[in-house]
Curated annotation (Swiss-Prot):
Residues 1405-1414 have a biased composition (Basic and acidic residues). The active site is at residue 145. In the C-terminal section; belongs to the TRAFAC class myosin-kinesin ATPase superfamily. Myosin family. This is Neither inactivation nor afterpotential protein C. ATP binds at residues 22-30, 45.
Length: 1501
């Protein structure tokens, strides 16, 4: 409706004299001016009149025109129109000028003067604002923008409410609006929710919420969430409890209660404005208003000379868009992807594209950080930026890698648990850069111990020079797995670090691929020595023509800057490298050893061999002499070892000679191994030198950062790429277990309504790679040990018929990874995997005169292939709190460098197992994930390639993670742990708190939290609940620390003032006899400690050898006896169950025979009345028996299947002949750290949980999409961009995904959950029995017609079910319960007969047309050690690609109902067409045992 007479408005030209701008809003500017007609000072509000602002101008004009006569509203003098020829016209509102400015400006000026408004002044301003709002509400007007900047003060202290641009008229006092509009910090929850709501819910109570926020603003100087992005602020308003004053204890109870009443999240329970004005906080003001006005006038006068403070430009949100003055509305993209309204791939990609174009590389997914490599990530940040992320919550700042470091640091201090940060993604996605930024910020947070942080940063820089190299897609790629274990003392000050390196890609040293650059340190070293003119000292030549440097004649054009092509910069880098090593206590001799080893490796690469008959000989012997001189080894031994080796056969040593090709391979293996030992030596020395500051400053706390290879694919992929990608595959599996599977299982076990989380489970792919004996890595090991080539690998892969590992060509295999399918060349697999260095060469190096080189080849290796070294014992400051870290000490060595050699595959498997164990130590271990994504393939700043990003999103499960964080509970804590952490937030310090469920609920209610859930033993928190509690915890801890520091200062001052200063030497000298006794006592203790060493080694934590030999036979006897006792109890329990079952069968048999004897006389059919309903004729109904609920998880029985598991260490002693043992091989399953406790509780998960777990693990509901993931080729070549095939299927997938939940809930599963949760197994059909033995496959192969007839006959009637028959014995038509009167399931639970809860996954493998011999044999599903089922391999290898699941769930036989004919649930007749009662026999109903009634048709037998 038009209120403004636009055409008749006068022109303001020559009517006003404009002075200065006094305010600026989103839609207008306000100026102080003088009206020339009457010299009156007025306020001019000028705004553009266009289509966007027309409605707001009309509404503001109507409000000013009709209601400006109220004393708390500004006077309205008129409106004018200024025509503009080049733009929209301007509308000038002329209003009363308030010389005092805004209320919030006065508050901030007082705060700058270290003064604060008293509560009565705040109450007066709020009361006057309430009166203005009541006047508007009385006239059915919603203001919708009440805040401190819109409350004006006159020079005499009057209060005026202004700015009606967002005000709107409603139909009645309780009328509703439905537009999400306003300033974010002052929005009520219903206003924020209006963006998603379809019905209008905004009433005048929204102004009450804004009034409460304004009260906080006047008290603290700024509103809550003032420093947050609008999306973060709106998310906090909805999800978290209402905000409070910054320091509530500094204010009275009345103002806190007023704010609490105003900020009621439920709009229906929130008071009206007329009720708020009656609150004691406002009514207890003094009646003399003139006094209050004079006080405010004095404060205005006091703050007049204070310089105007800078204010951020105003903004407001309008239906998902952010508006600022003179700027186009920008769509509001959330910083947290878990806050997306409609989480689909398109919305996520659009949000990421917008953020990266705005220069924002990071986004949150709840508590997980998503990082996009924008090709311009900063390496250095000022101290002010670091300070923004110090002890802050996740939502207080923009998403950044520093927030992950800050949260991990706080969790480490609060929970006293080590924190892990795992970075994952493909190559060049920014993992190593983010890891370095994490370390920088952690050094900032832990700064305090002199020199500790500097040594840590320098050490990391030196290690990266050793292990980084250039690849075709990354000029600074990390070529190993690095663990940075940063240690901190009790107070959080950094004390040092422990560095662990695994899987160094040492083969890179000698590779012939020119596109793969060598490690950076080689280029640094050579260019530095060349610049220093020291080449002759290290037997090097002047040109860079070294085979291992791989320097091309001409530098090829590249978008990346490689270290190889920057000789000038390399000089400074190597100088920095040596300075770092000097700073961390490397002596000159050790630095010289490093130089000589690097020079020797370069020379080894230039050794040439020539053919001498059948064997090889060294062509350039002068290089061999130079190498022997550098390494200080015997030249003749070294020369001989290059072309000869010793073969021991039958106890006889024979000399063998290499061929030319074998000699080259041996030379390259020596160079690679020498470099690997050098890197291990340097890292071990760094760890050793770091141990002293850790002992001095303490190392009770730790944060471990895991930086590793990125997932990669080149034009030719070998064994190195297979290992790298398999490691990433395992890290993805660990992510799935922690984010998805653990949550669903815990929710089901705790009786929480289980949600359906979908993700792509890559366990089957990993099983095909790592499971013994058919996993690909075991196949490679078999080929390597049997000296076979790739033919054996290709044959074994072809025999598996797996869809995850396939034969691609004659020499190539394809592996379906979680990112896509990659092709690997197997021709060099076996040679590379052997990693064989001749023992003769090892012995040559052991005889080196250089102590460091001798040490590198003398000490043993760990199972991961790393060098061990002797560490000096350092006395810790507090031995009671000393922590042990994974150092490569001598006690960790178990592999000789000469004997018992391990393959690279064995080292790789042990490394993967070690990493999984470290990340899965306990359920409450803090693991923080950083998911890194590469934004493009062109290396352009802020470039965004949608197909590339989308493929990585699919691989990393970004969409599934968003849904999981929206619906799930990321934190799950036991009651005692939860109350131990947070009880002081809601309970008094002297209040007794029991660790119960009720107290957990009381804590949540006192804190006004929402979204949580309580299970039987655990608290379930959403990620924003956990963040809110952490923020409260941090605030309270700061207060505690401040109080403690003040009390300590007070006590210290009292002691000094009272003269109670403790002085040393106060005690006089003791008698010489006493001194002699003390010396003798100390000497005797020292002598005994030397004579009797401790039983446990302090460094390794293991028993010494003598003690272990003494204890071993007793421990073995005790263990065998314990196992025997367990087996006896197990066998006794099974015998007892068998006796119970036999007794029941005996009773059943006796009563059955007795009943049949009474029913031998047949009843004529014509005498049966089918319509009889008289109870007197039918007889009384049996009385139902009261039954106790039956729960398997309450039975104190634990599955002992693991005792006979061949993979278990106990069973290895019992079944030594059944294992394929290999020397020093670890047979532990690759996923053993993630397998759950094999107890009966885990076996007793309900069918619903199993159904959902199988659905998400196998993607049975979206088979096409899951097939697309592992069948799609993974390709990374910036020169040849390929269309992402997944993009073409996205629309169909999104449509299917949106309707997934409804389809899932409406699916007919054949069984239904009971309404009660007391019995999670109640209501499920019993499993069908195995079919009768069938003829062999040869019989059917020769008689196909007989096979067809038998198949049709079996499918014509349901299989018999004796368990269902027993159930029906105790029921009548009036009893709807499904529990038996006796515990027959308990009898069957430990027998081979399947239980009722397992019926839904059993399947008859009776497919037509199959020639397999066991196609008609009943096959129960396999069991893992956890007791949970997984799909049979046959299902995964089906040609349809449907994982073998949809048939098991969708085509299952429905169990017969209670009202079916008893014959259908008892034994089936041979002739299924018999329908008459005469053929069926006579109907009999008789109680054969107490509570057991037999009813059915009887025939003579």
């Amino acid at each position: 409706m038009m209120y403004l007479p636009y055409a008749q408005l006068p022109d303001p030209t020559d009517k006003f004299e404009i002075y200065e701008e006094i305010a600026q809003g989103v839609n207008a500017k306000v100026f102080r001016a003088k009206e020339l007609d009457n010299d009156r000072i007025v306020a001019l509000k000028i705004q553009h009149y266009d289509e966007e602002h027309q409605v707001s101008i009309e509404e503001e004009y109507r409000t000013l025109r009709d209601y400006c006569d109220h004393p708390n509203l500004p006077e309205f003098y008129g409106v004018y129109k200024l025509s503009k020829p080049n733009g929209p016209d301007e509308i000038w509102f002329v209003m009363e000028y308030c010389a005092g400015g805004t209320a919030v400006d006065m508050v901030n000026k007082l705060l700058k003067l270290d003064r604060r408004m008293r509560e009565e002044h705040i109450a007066y301003i709020i009361r006057e604002t309430c009166r203005a709002a009541i006047e508007l509400n009385r006239n059915h007007v919603l203001h919708r923008d009440i805040r401190g900047d819109n409350i004006l003060l006159t020079k005499n202290g009057r209060v005026k409410l202004c700015d009606f641009g967002l005000s709107r008229q409603v139909d009645s006092t309780l009328g509703k609006r439905g537009t999400c509009i306003g300033s974010p910090c002052w929005m009520a929850p219903e206003v924020v929710s209006a963006m998603e709501s379809r019905e209008p819910d905004i009433t005048v109570r929204a102004d009450v919420w804004a009034l409460g926020i304004t009260t906080i603003e006047l008290a603290d100087g700024k509103p809550p969430f003032a420093d947050m992005h609008p999306t973060r602020a709106m998310f906090q308003i909805i999800r978290n409890p209402p905000p409070t004053l910054m320091r509530p204890t500094n204010w009275s109870q009345q103002i806190n209660d007023f704010i609490s009443e105003s900020l009621e999240k439920n709009a229906e329970n929130r008071p009206m404005m007329v009720e708020m004005v009656e609150h004691p906080f406002l009514t207890e003001l003094i009646e003399n208003e003139d006094e209050m006005r004079s006080d405010i006038a004095e404060m205005l006068e006091l703050s007049r000379d204070v310089k105007t403070l800078y204010k951020e430009p105003e903004l407001f949100v309008d239906r998902g868009y952010v508006k600022r003055f003179d700027e186009k509305p920008e769509k509001m993209y959330p910083e947290d992807l878990a806050a997306l309204e409609n989480p689909v791939d398109e919305n996520i990609i659009e949000s990421l594209r917008h953020r990266i174009l705005m220069g924002e590389s990071y986004s949150f997914i709840g508590d997980i950080l998503l990082s996009l490599n924008s090709n311009e990530i900063k390496q250095e940040f000022p101290q002010e930026f670091h300070a923004k992320y110090r002890f802050k919550s996740r939502s207080e700042n923009q998403p950044h890698i520093f927030s992950v470091a800050d949260i991990a640091y706080q969790d480490m201090l609060h929970h006293k648990e080590p924190q892990h940060i795992v970075l994952s993604g493909e190559s060049y996605s920014g993992k190593s850069t983010n890891a370095r930024l994490l370390i920088k910020h952690l050094c900032y947070l832990g700064d305090g111990n002199r020199g500790a942080t500097g040594r840590v940063e320098s050490s990391i820089k030196a290690i990266l020079m050793l292990v980084n190299a250039g690849t075709p897609v990354n000029n600074d790629s990390t070529r190993c797995v690095l663990q940075y274990c940063l240690t901190f003392g009790k107070t959080g000050k950094m004390s040092g670090a422990v560095f662990n390196m695994y899987m160094l890609e040492k083969l890179r040293v000698a590779t012939t691929d020119g596109t793969q650059h060598n490690f950076h340190i080689f280029y640094y070293f050579y260019d530095f020595i060349n610049q220093q003119n020291q080449l002759k000292e290290y037997n090097l030549k002047a040109d860079r023509n070294y085979r291992y440097l791989r320097v091309p004649p001409e530098v090829p054009p590249s978008k990346l800057k490689y270290r190889r092509d920057d000789p000038e910069g390399n000089v400074e880098r190597y100088r920095e490298f040596e300075n770092i090593l000097r700073d961390i206590d490397f002596n000159h001799k050790q630095l010289e050893t490093v130089r000589k080893v690097l020079a020797a490796i370069l020379n080894i690469g230039n050794i040439r061999f020539r053919q001498n008959g059948k064997y090889a000989e060294v062509e350039n012997t002068d290089i061999v002499s130079r190498i022997a001189e550098l390494l200080r080894v015997d030249e003749k031994k070294f020369m001989w070892s290059l072309t000869n080796f010793i073969m021991v056969k039958g106890g006889i040593a024979e000399r063998r000679q290499y061929t030319t090709e074998e000699a080259r391979d041996a030379r390259d293996a020596v160079a690679s191994t020498l470099y690997s030992r050098l890197v291990d030596f340097i890292i071990n020395r760094i760890n050793m030198n770091m141990s002293f500051p850790r002992a001095v400053f303490g190392d009770t706390n730790a944060i471990i950062i895991h930086d590793m290879f990125g997932f990669e694919c080149f034009n030719r992929n070998g064994l190195e790429q297979l290992m790298i990608n398999t490691l990433n595959e395992q890290m993805q599996y660990h992510y799935n277990q922690r984010i998805f599977i653990s949550e669903m299982l815990e929710m089901e076990a705790e009786d929480i309504d289980t949600i359906n989380l979908n993700f792509y489970d890559n366990k089957t792919a990993l099983d095909n790679l790592l499971t013994k004996p058919d996993g690909l890595f075991y196949i490679i090991d078999d080929a390597s040990r049997s000296c076979q080539d790739q033919d054996l690998i290709m044959d074994r892969v072809s025999e598996k018929h797996s869809q995850f590992v396939k034969k691609h060509t004659a020499t190539e295999i394809s592996v379906a990874h979680y990112t896509g399918r990659i092709i690997y060349d197997t021709r060099a697999f076996t040679d590379i995997n052997r990693d064989f260095v001749p023992p003769e060469m090892i012995e040559t190096f052991r005889s080196s005169l250089d102590e460091s080189i001798m040490l590198m080849f003398t000490n043993q290796l760990t199972k991961a292939g790393n060098l061990t070294m002797p560490f000096e014992a350092v006395q810790h400051k507090d031995e009671s709190e000393r922590k042990s870290y994974a150092l490569n000490t001598l006690s960790a060595g178990c592999i000789s460098q000469v004997n018992n050699l391990r393959t690279l595959a064995a080292n790789f498997r042990f490394t993967c197992l070690t990493l999984l164990k470290m990340l899965s130590q306990n359920a409450n271990l803090g693991v923080h994930f950083v998911r890194c994504i590469r934004a493009d393939l062109e290396y352009k700043p802020r470039s965004f390639h949608s197909d590339v990003v989308q493929q990585q999103m699919k691989a990393l499960g970004v969409l599934d993670t968003v849904i999981a964080r929206q619906k799930g509970f990321s934190s799950r804590l036991p009651f005692d742990e939860f109350l131990r952490r947070y009880q002081f937030l809601a309970f008094d310090f002297d209040e007794p708190v029991e660790m119960t469920k009720d107290n957990c609920r009381l804590l949540f209610l006192r804190l006004k939290m929402e979204g949580w859930a309580l299970g039987k033993t655990k608290v379930f928190l959403r990620y924003y609940n956990d963040e809110f509690l952490a923020r409260l915890y941090e605030l309270q801890v700061k207060k505690v620390i401040k109080v403690q520091s003040m009390m300590r200062a007070l006590l210290a001052r009292k002691r000094v003032k009272g003269g109670k200063v403790f002085k040393l030497g106060k005690k006089g000298p003791e008698h010489h006899d006493v001194a002699a006794s003390k010396i003798q006592k100390a000497f005797r203790g020292f002598r005994d400690r030397v004579r009797l060493p401790p039983l446990v080694n302090e460094k390794s934590g293991q028993l010494n050898e003598n003690t272990a030999d003494f204890i071993r036979p007793f421990a073995k006897k005790w263990r065998e006896k314990s196992i025997f006792q367990v087996l006896l109890h197990y066998r006794a329990a099974r015998f007892q169950d068998f006796v119970n079952l036999s007794q029941q069968v005996h009773i059943y048999n006796q009563r059955m025979v007795a009943g049949l004897n009474k029913c031998t006389r047949a009843v004529p059919f014509e005498r049966i009345n089918m319509r009889e309903v008289n109870s007197s004729q039918l007889g009384p109904l049996p009385v139902p028996i009261k039954k106790m609920p039956f729960r398997l998880d309450q039975i104190p029985f634990y599955d002992t299947q693991y005792m006979v598991d061949p993979a278990n260490s106990i069973s290895r002693q019992a079944f030594p002949n059944q294992l394929l043992t290999q020397h020093m091989e670890d047979d532990e399953p690759w996923d053993s750290p993630l397998q759950r406790n094999p107890s009966m509780t885990s076996c007793a998960l309900t069918y619903n949980a199993y159904k959902k777990e199988q659905a998400c693990q196998t993607n049975w509901d979206r088979m096409g999409e899951s097939d697309n993931i592992y069948n799609q080729g993974y390709f990374r070549d910036p020169q040849q961009l390929r269309r992402n095939q997944m993009q073409m299927n996205m629309n169909a997938y999104n449509n299917a995904y949106n309707s997934y939940n409804s389809n899932y809930n409406n699916q007919n599963w054949g069984v239904h959950r009971s309404g009660s949760r007391r019995n999670s197994l109640k209501g499920y059909a019993a499993p069908p029995p195995p079919p009768p033995p069938m003829p062999s496959s040869n019989y059917y192969r020769n008689n196909p017609n007989q096979q067809q007839r038998n198949y049709q006959q079996r499918s014509s009637y349901p299989p018999s079910d004796p368990v269902r028959e027993l159930q029906n014995m105790a029921r009548n038509e009036g009893d709807n319960s499904e529990d038996p009167p006796f515990n027959f399931k308990a009898m069957l639970r430990k027998t081979n007969y399947p239980r009722g809860s397992e019926t839904n996954t059993y399947d008859f493998n009776n497919r037509r047309g199959s020639d397999s011999g066991d196609q008609h044999t009943f096959q129960p599903p396999k069991l893992r050690s956890t007791g949970r089922r997984y799909q049979d391999d046959e299902g995964y290898n089906s040609s349809s690609g449907n994982y073998g699941v949809s048939r098991k769930f969708g085509q299952q036989q429905r169990a017969p109902t209670l009202r079916q004919s008893p014959a259908s649930v008892g034994r089936s007749f041979e002739d299924s067409n018999a329908r008459s009662f005469e053929e069926a026999g006579s109907y009999v109903e008789e109680e054969i045992a107490p509570g057991i009634t037999l009813s059915g048709y009887a025939v003579d037998i």
